[in-house]
């Protein structure tokens, strides 16, 4: 992970995920296929997605939580013209549920920001996944990207 997002990020390696000009691309996940495609002189991209507005908002939310362990919700509201508590009402409810990350001490939700705690660092991917709308719509039983432990 990185603390500051650049304008474009090209993925290198098996299963790498790149972010170029508003689109995500994931490299081949099998090593043999990755090298087969490279040897044929092509980029080893398995799939890609053009991001819509909601994707961009969620990407920023997830990236900032995972890379900075902190999310300035006021800044996000300003950047995207949203009211964070309304836009992410369902996600905030999941975070604050009786058996959710807040109750386990992984996350602190304060006015204007969300912070991953010291203990929460070990579970930051699990917390960030709450903001990933595609995980909810998955029906194949296979992970979309990588799994957490």
Spans of features found by a protein language model:
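Short, amphipathic alpha-helical interaction segments positioned at domain boundaries
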Residues: 119-149
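Short amphipathic alpha-helical interaction segments
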Residues: 83-100
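A short, conserved structural fragment
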Residues: 98-112
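Minor-groove-contacting beta-hairpin "wing" of winged helix-turn-helix DNA-binding domains
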Residues: 113-117
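C-terminal scaffold of the Radical SAM
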Residues: 1-85, 142-149
């Amino acid at each position: 992970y990185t603390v500051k997002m650049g304008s474009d990020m090209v993925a290198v390696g098996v299963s790498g995920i790149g972010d170029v000009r508003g689109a995500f691309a994931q490299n081949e996940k099998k090593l043999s296929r990755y090298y087969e495609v490279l040897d044929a002189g092509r980029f080893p991209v398995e799939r890609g997605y053009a991001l819509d507005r909601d994707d961009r908002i969620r990407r920023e939310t997830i990236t900032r939580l995972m890379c900075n362990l902190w999310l300035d919700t006021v800044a996000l509201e300003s950047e995207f013209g949203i009211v964070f508590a309304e836009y992410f009402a369902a996600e905030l409810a999941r975070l604050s549920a009786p058996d959710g990350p807040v109750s386990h001490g992984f996350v602190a939700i304060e006015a204007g920001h969300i912070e991953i705690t010291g203990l929460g660092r070990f579970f930051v991917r699990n917390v960030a996944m709450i903001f990933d709308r595609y995980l909810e719509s998955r029906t194949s039983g296979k992970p979309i990207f990588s799994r957490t432990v």
